[in-house]
Design a protein with these regions (language model features):
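An anion-engaging/catalytic patch
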Residues: 1-150
Length: 150
C-alpha cells in the first residue's frame, strides 16, 4: 500500500494520518485520536482498554478491520500503529466517554437523522446538495448542470 504521511492538528494536538492512494482513503492513528478526545496521559493503554471493551460488546467486525501502518513516532522513528479509516474512526469516537467527543457524537447524530430523512424524502438530498454547492461558491448555472447530470 502506497501511503503519504501527514500530521493533522486538532486543538493543537497532532494526529498522524496517512493517505492510501490505491484505496483513496485516509487512515488515522487511533492512539492519537484517543489521546486528544479522552485527555489521557497514557493513550496506548486507553486504546488497549477500549479495544477490549469494543470486543466484549460485540464490535468484532470493527476490531478486525483495524490495520497497522508504519507512522513516524514522536522520537522520529517509524513504528507500526493501529489506524482506522474514516468510518471505523467515527465508530470508535462513539465509544469514547469524554466531553471532547460530544461534538463529534452530536454531529454524527445530526448526519444520521439527515440521512434517514433523505431516505424517506429523496428530494431533500437535492435541496441539501444545492445548499452545499452554493456555500462552496459555485454558480447556480454550474449547479443546475451538475444536478441535471445526476
Amino acid at each position: 500500500m502506497e501511503q503519504n504521511d501527514k500530521i493533522q492538528l486538532f486543538e493543537d494536538k497532532r494526529i498522524r494520518t496517512a493517505w492510501d492512494e490505491e484505496k483513496e482513503e485516509w487512515y488515522f492513528s487511533i492512539v492519537d485520536v484517543c489521546e486528544v478526545l479522552s485527555g489521557t496521559d497514557n493513550p496506548r493503554r486507553y486504546w488497549s482498554d477500549l479495544k477490549r471493551k469494543l470486543k466484549s460488546e460485540g464490535a468484532v467486525e470493527l476490531y478486525e478491520k483495524i490495520v497497522q501502518l508504519k507512522m513516524t513516532a514522536p522520537d522520529g522513528k517509524k513504528r507500526l500503529t493501529d489506524v482506522a479509516d474514516t468510518e471505523q474512526l467515527l465508530r470508535i469516537i462513539q465509544s469514547i466517554p469524554s466531553p471532547k467527543a460530544e461534538p463529534f457524537k452530536l454531529w454524527l447524530a445530526q448526519v444520521g437523522r439527515e440521512r434517514i430523512e433523505e431516505t424517506i424524502d429523496p428530494e431533500l438530498t437535492i435541496d441539501r446538495a444545492l445548499e452545499t454547492y452554493l456555500k462552496k461558491g459555485y454558480t447556480r448555472e454550474w449547479i443546475n448542470q451538475r444536478l441535471q447530470a445526476i
